[in-house]
């Protein structure tokens, strides 16, 4: 369901790949002997996910979505990006007659929080708060606001049926709070890190409330697990990992993930965290960036075409089948001179633009273009791409010889912030 096309890179992957190294890392991943191997729970999750908990989530989600118009999803980083990526990719940006998902806890902007509070005052809403520890600043202070808003509106007893916590199985501030107040809880597995957690209750529960077919998401992830089992370049995830690693070793500093579909913007944000937080350490790693074409061609297209070379390469997501399509209507006066497009659909025009841009950037601009060919934008495809990117990331990070599953650098800003806020115990 994902094919890696290297026709626009001038790279002979069979010549640049170290097949013995790929086999070695493949064994390291699946035998769980590499750095950070305690966090490889995602590897077999499409098979080993907790079926009993999943059925319980379905029951709770069905009950909740019959009571609310809006679900406030409170989390930051991996606690919300994957869910939002799935929601927008599958349902689109302007879905109707379904529970709306609104995301908070991902910012400390007072203006944004105030706007969400005002929006919810006349809405029936529930809360899904997601935090392993329950002490992360952004979701913690956000949950205080929206829990109070909900309890003040419906009372504590009613709120118990409208608040769900996704957290640690046994410990942590959020787990203790949920048990004390009687909120339903589901578990964040100990062996799956936040940026890998979208197929756990972290992402699956809010998506169930939104009405997305999560059974198909799991089917897609399982298909990817079965497809991506080989220890050579026939494995498309490894092919992608190897070519991006080769370009990094050639001196490229940035990879731009390009989509021609606006509803994939949050997918690119999820991808940026997955690769940036996993590889950006020990003074190594590509800077993951993203653009939406053709929109960003009108702002960054000039730089991409004629800016510095050997700095950035592009990875393009190409969608074979759009969720919907429509034709350009004819205008009798042809005032804009665009009647020549009336026999073409918007998707045909979009795909033609993609081809033209790839030619401009890769041939004229001498910028390598990797093309990831996706079949569609649905539930099954989402599950597939999650597993594809996570496995590709594991291979890519081990090729860099870094631990894909830790993030020690993020503690620096947290310490400085806590010190400035006079947090107890911080000196």
UniProtKB/Swiss-Prot annotation:
KW Cytoplasm (keyword) present? yes
| EC annotation from Swiss-Prot or TrEMBL | 5.3.1.9
> Which InterPro entries does the entry mention?
G6P_Isomerase (IPR001672), Phosphoglucose_isomerase_CS (IPR018189), SIS_dom_sf (IPR046348), SIS_PGI_1 (IPR035476), SIS_PGI_2 (IPR035482)
Determine if Cytoplasm is one of this entry's keywords: yes
Q: What class of enzyme is it?
A: isomerase
Q: Where in the cell is it found?
A: Cytoplasm
CC terms in the record's Gene Ontology section = cytosol
Catalytic activities: alpha-D-glucose 6-phosphate = beta-D-fructose 6-phosphate
Entry-linked Pfam families: PGI (PF00342)
Please state the pathway this protein functions in, per its UniProt record.
Carbohydrate biosynthesis; gluconeogenesis; Carbohydrate degradation; glycolysis; D-glyceraldehyde 3-phosphate and glycerone phosphate from D-glucose: step 2/4
Record-stated family: Belongs to the GPI family.
NCBIfam families annotated for this entry? PRK14097.1
Please give the function described in this protein's UniProt entry.
Catalyzes the reversible isomerization of glucose-6-phosphate to fructose-6-phosphate.
Q: What is this protein called?
A: Glucose-6-phosphate isomerase
Q: From what organism does this protein derive?
A: Mycoplasma capricolum subsp. capricolum (strain California kid / ATCC 27343 / NCTC 10154)
Lineage summary: Bacteria, Bacillati, Mycoplasmatota, Mollicutes, Mycoplasmataceae
